[in-house]
Amino acid sequence: MTKNYIFITGGVVSSLGKGIAAASLGAVLEARNLKITIMKLDPYINVDPGTMSPIQHGEVFVTEDGAETDLDLGHYERFIRTKMTCLNNFTTGSIYSEVLKKERRGDYLGSTIQVIPHITNAIKDRIILCSKNSDIILVEIGGTVGDIESLPFLEAIRQLAVDIGRKNVIYIHLTLVPYIKTAGEIKTKPTQHSVKELLSIGIQPDILICRSQKTVPINERKKIALFCNVPVNAVISLKDVDSIYTIPKLLKDQKLDNYICEYFKLNVPQADLKEWEKVIYEEKNASKEIIIGIIGKYIKLPDAYKSVIEALKHAGLKNKIKVKIELINSQEIENKNFKLLQNLNGILIPGGFGDRGIIGKLLSVQYARENNIPYFGICLGMQIAIIEFAQNVIGIKEANSTEFDPQCKFPVIDLIKTKKNDIKDTRQGKKNNKSNFGGTMRLGSQPCKLIFNSLSRKLYKKDTIIERHRHRYEVNNFLLKKIEKNGLKIAGRSKKNNIVEIIEIFDHPWFIGCQFHPEFTSTPRDGHPLFIDFIKSAKKNKKNNFKIKVKNV
């Protein structure tokens, strides 16, 4: 089958939801038995998001093969079955880095290196490389049309239509159609100007997806079609919705998938969205509500915990209950402000870096452990649980992680042995030209062997699991025997190098910590066993209406 490409651009303003639109369209096309993959092209100069601030950029989504990517790839995996790889996301920085390496090697034979053709050719090569095993490749171009940063990407996708044939390319432009409340009108002018900007680059959009507070009426759609030179049935209205998982149905109801399949001359069955209809039904019919607290330090931007938040919601669907999420700054708990925790039915500490807010996290773990509140620790959250247990159950008050105190006397958490030479002295703030944080972690999918009588083994229903990782610190084995004698059990270790992967407290209603990131593999259709059981336990916690007596922690 001929490879077909759909390029998705955005106009007027940023943050319109190109990633959600691309993922939703991918879900509908996949439901027509088409093999789909989705790419994200980011116009920033960073090589990848791995060292970017979560408060600026949101979470870093880790793929199976260990690529640190844009959070939109998380949306892609939650909507379609295809797993993303390092090929599905690249940046301006990675393209320039690749071209400059080739120039240094002499690959260009002394040519003057320019944006056109060298940068644009590198972009096109990456897009084609990712398309090998797919029928349709959706490519989301980051940024907004008109931004200087996006120009090389836009030029590259313009050229691709010439290279592979215009009949094999669809350009979708996502644009804002604002509703002016005081006038009671929907305005089409911003969309017209955005398309004009795109035309000046040499790209005529085939489809317009119009984002608005309300459904864009047919008369306004006809007006947009006339001035933007697209068919009326290719002007799609995408209004604000309560749940992003309703969007595949919204697109199908407007026959967007039919238009695309007819354009590409694809003879495929109609989309079967029964799985998505089930998800929507579960959302609408969830009864009651539980409150889960996420204790972190990046709470100013909820997208910093995007996959965790979505995984909790997925687990709520499977338990037929609404999950209300409270993002709590761990620093606010450092003065023992436990009122922030008293109404929670479950406590989750996600991954993170650095020592800011650690005391608040330690107190939160102690509060959950001593008051029988379901606790879920992910990555750093597991390490914090071990430190807290060593300090307050075993009585080793100086127990700590070398991430927070490089000279600590009892390092229950330490750098992974293979990573100690990678980051040099960066953890102590001493940097030189060989120091590097980027790409120095244990990344991607790793196998883990589960202990037979553990809760984790019961939930996964298998002896060996494969989960994704992103860390450079591990549990130090030197105190583990003493820790296990006091009630905290090792429920799983990595097969390759015996790293502690899962911990449990058996005599607690629900207390699990994992070194990996299960949130990256949770989907609305399937959920994830750890999250599903965590929410089940939190639901039981509320049902039993435990009266918490705050202990002196």
Curated annotation (Swiss-Prot):
Pathway, per record: Pyrimidine metabolism; CTP biosynthesis via de novo pathway; CTP from UDP: step 2/2
Limits of the Glutamine amidotransferase type-1 domain: 291-544
Class in the EC hierarchy, top level: ligase
GO biological process per UniProt: 'de novo' CTP biosynthetic process; pyrimidine nucleobase biosynthetic process
GO cellular component: cytosol
Residues that hold UTP according to the record: S14, K187, T188, K189, P190, T191, Q192, K223
Protein known as: CTP synthase
Organism taxonomic ancestry: Bacteria, Pseudomonadati, Pseudomonadota, Gammaproteobacteria, Enterobacterales
